[in-house]
Amino acid sequence: MSDIKDGNNDHLVQSDDPEHPANLIPALCRNFYSHGWVTGTGGGASIKRDNHIFIAPSGVQKELIQPHNIFVLSYPTPKYPPSARQYIRKPLKLNPSACTPLFLAAFERGAGCCIHTHSQWAVLVTLLVEREKGPEGCFEISNIEQIKGIPRGKGKGMMGFYDTLKIPIIENTAFEEDLTQSLEEAMEMYPDTYAVLVRRHGIYVWGDDVAKAKTQCESLDYLFQLAVEMHRLGLPWVKS
């Protein structure tokens, strides 16, 4: 493994391959920006490839990210303390993502990509669930075709039309990294989930690879928007 002391390892983010993580992350962030998911520098994305983790920087306009802005970690690496994380590439004058320990939690579950968005629809459903079910409630919806875009769990295939999708919700914190414990607890309580909502904040979605994480994120956002409109029309999310 190349040590960052020997140079900034710029070769790790230099590739003509559009499927290289250093090229995919900027492309994903531009796509997410067009959906309104990562406005105002919010949100982020991370990809694991072999023993490297590629992460979008913090505090940067996501639609303007370039490959040379990407951080690279050696994997496995400690989540805490931040000083123990094994960065092998750090862009000059940029800050590591505050989402890093949450991304690492997803990779510990076998994910190949993790996405964090500030989707308005995700935020709205967390508020509606809190009002209708209280702070312990989770998001549930059934009998909607798009549910088929979400896995049942690792190695269990995809959900069906008649299944009830459940997404846990955790409370927001003042600092992003402080969400890690709650996220991990939700993962333990819902071992088949591929997403965790954060009340008044957004959502974390992960998948076995980039394509799966992206399409699952899109499917969930579709379902959240639909759920908000269904609620407005007085329609139940779960068909009895």
Swiss-Prot record:
Catalytic activity line of the entry: 5-(methylsulfanyl)-D-ribulose 1-phosphate = 5-methylsulfanyl-2,3-dioxopentyl phosphate + H2O
Cofactor binding summary note: Binds 1 zinc ion per subunit.
Compartments reported by the entry: Cytoplasm
InterPro entries assigned: Aldolase_II/adducin_N, Aldolase_II/adducin_N_sf, MethylthioRu-1-P_deHdtase_MtnB, Salvage_MtnB_euk
Residues given in the record as Zn(2+) binding sites: 116, 118, 201
Superkingdom of the organism of origin: Eukaryota
Statement: the UniProt record of this protein carries the keyword Zinc: yes
Major localization class: cytoplasm
A Gene Ontology term for the protein's cellular component: cytoplasm
Gene3D superfamilies documented for this protein: Class II aldolase/adducin N-terminal domain (3.40.225.10)
EC code: 4.2.1.109
Keywords on record: Amino-acid biosynthesis, Cytoplasm, Lyase, Metal-binding, Methionine biosynthesis, Zinc
Cofactor(s) for this UniProt protein: Zn(2+)
Active-site feature positions: 145
Residue positions binding substrate: 99
UniProt pathway: Amino-acid biosynthesis; L-methionine biosynthesis via salvage pathway; L-methionine from S-methyl-5-thio-alpha-D-ribose 1-phosphate: step 2/6
GO BP terms: L-methionine salvage from methylthioadenosine
Function (record text): Catalyzes the dehydration of methylthioribulose-1-phosphate (MTRu-1-P) into 2,3-diketo-5-methylthiopentyl-1-phosphate (DK-MTP-1-P).
Family that this chain belongs to: Belongs to the aldolase class II family. MtnB subfamily.
Record-given protein name: Methylthioribulose-1-phosphate dehydratase
Organism (species): Paracoccidioides brasiliensis (strain Pb03)
Gene (name only): MDE1
